[in-house]
């Protein structure tokens, strides 16, 4: 797959939908409003502390993804990158749940973008922004 297009290329089969849905359900059950106990659950603790706590974790995990990818560039085992991406996804799923969203919302957005060049999409966004600015009095 090229970096500027989301056109499908022979990719390995992905069987993550069920796992993501199960994890999303667990995260949802750990919300304080659903009885999540911050003393017994890491997810409940992050959600109880509020957005600053889980957003900080997302930033940390994103940095760890970058560092792991750089390590792979220098010969490290790629499984470390997978491990760090899993942490990033997990904490991102906590944010999604907090804001009333689910992995299915992200999948729907990726499907919407499928087959669209990133360059074309960026140009369209700029065009729409320009039109909105011109429409303002």
From Swiss-Prot:
HAMAP family: HisE (MF_01020). GO terms for cellular component: cytoplasm. Residues 114-124 have a biased composition (Basic and acidic residues). The keyword Hydrolase applies. It catalyses: 1-(5-phospho-beta-D-ribosyl)-ATP + H2O = 1-(5-phospho-beta-D-ribosyl)-5'-AMP + diphosphate + H(+). It comes from the Bacteria. It comes from Paracidovorax citrulli (strain AAC00-1) (Acidovorax citrulli). Pathway: Amino-acid biosynthesis; L-histidine biosynthesis; L-histidine from 5-phospho-alpha-D-ribose 1-diphosphate: step 2/9. This is Phosphoribosyl-ATP pyrophosphatase. The gene is hisE. Pfam families: PRA-PH.
């Amino acid at each position: 797959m090229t970096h500027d297009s989301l056109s499908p290329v022979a990719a390995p089969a992905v069987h993550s939908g069920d796992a993501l849905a199960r994890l999303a359900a667990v995260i949802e059950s750990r919300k304080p409003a659903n009885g999540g106990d911050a003393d017994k659950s890491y997810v409940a603790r992050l959600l109880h502390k509020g957005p600053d706590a889980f957003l900080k974790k997302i930033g940390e995990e994103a940095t760890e993804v970058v560092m792991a990818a750089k390590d792979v560039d220098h010969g490290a085992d790629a499984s470390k990158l997978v491990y760090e991406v899993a942490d990033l996804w997990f904490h991102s799923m906590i944010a999604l749940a907090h804001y009333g969203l689910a992995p299915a919302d992200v999948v729907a957005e990726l499907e919407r973008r499928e087959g669209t060049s990133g360059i074309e999409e960026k140009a369209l966004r700029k065009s729409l922004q320009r039109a909105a600015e011109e429409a303002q009095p």
